C-alpha cells in the first residue's frame, strides 16, 4: 500500500493550478537572472593562454572559430586521470549535441581539460561525442578561473574525513583522491570584440545543474532525485550502466 497522500482528480487539479503559478513565477525569475547575467561587466582577458587543439596550438581568441561568443566547459580530466570524471561526462552527454545549435547563434561551445590532448580525444571517441575538446594543460587557464587546486589549498580537505563518493569517483578516474579533487568543474563564457577577448560569466557547483538534464527530468517524477548523502553516487558514464 502506498504511503503517499491519495486524492481525487479535483483535489489534484486545484493543487496543480496553484503549483503552476509558482512554476511560472520561477520561470519569470529565471528570465530576470538571465538578463542580469548579460548585464555583468566584461573583463578583458590579458593573459596569453595557449591551448593544444586538433588543429594545432591556439590562443583563446583562436578558439572562437570565427564567432563572437565562446562557451567553455571545464571538464574534470587532469594529467593523472585515466578517464574523465563521470559527472562531467554526464554533462558532456547533454552539451555535445547542442554545439551545432549554438553555432547557428554565433556561439562556439567546447570542452577544456588539463590532460594531454591525445588522452582527451581517445576518451571522446569512446563516449561518441561530436564536440571540440582542447587541452589547457600548458597554461594557467583552469587555475586562474578557480578550477585547479594546489596541495596546500586541498590540505584541510585531505586531512579530514574523505566522503566515500569522492573516493569512488577517484577510483573510476584511475587516480587518487588528491589527483581527483585537484580539478574542478565549471563553465566560462567569453566575448570577442575588435580583437579583444572578454570574460563575461563563470559558474561552478550547482550553477551547472542546468546541464544535468536528468535531474530536471527526475525532479518531475514521483520519487524525485531519490538520493541520500550517505549512499554511493549512482551516476556512471553512459556506457557503464547495466540496463535491464
Language-model segments: which ranges?
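Non-globular targeting/processing and membrane-anchoring segments
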Residues: 1-105, 122-128, 132, 139-244
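Short internal beta-strands
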Residues: 109-114
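Duplex nucleic acid-engaging cores and interfaces of nucleic-acid transaction enzymes
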Residues: 117
